[in-house]
Amino acid sequence: MALIFDLTEDPQQVVQVSAWVGDWHSYVVRLVDEMGSPVDITTGTLGATFTNIATGSAYSFGGGSVTLTKQYSAQGILSVLNPAAYPTSADIRLTVSFTVGSTVRRFGPLEIEVLAP
């Protein structure tokens, strides 16, 4: 059974996980509003951003693109597959965007501490 992380629109509610350099992860997340209710993602466009917390710049996987797969759209559940394995240790912030028309909503962050073995 997969662990499902709730990502909210409140950037103060941070979810933290750890991973090893060389790991290639998929995360299952549920997008929820400020009240904790799931956001229906049936229609609209999803995006993901990986940011190095220390520098504020994009975290580089060295190639590839993130894969976002809607699992249970009405419940706001999707999987986020990294573009590649983590190449370097860092503290990373993953945020997910959901766009319908001209309205962009942002969820997260999921903070990932990538550790060197």
Regions found by a protein language model. Give the residues of each.
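Contiguous segments within soluble domain cores/interaction surfaces
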Residues: M1-P117
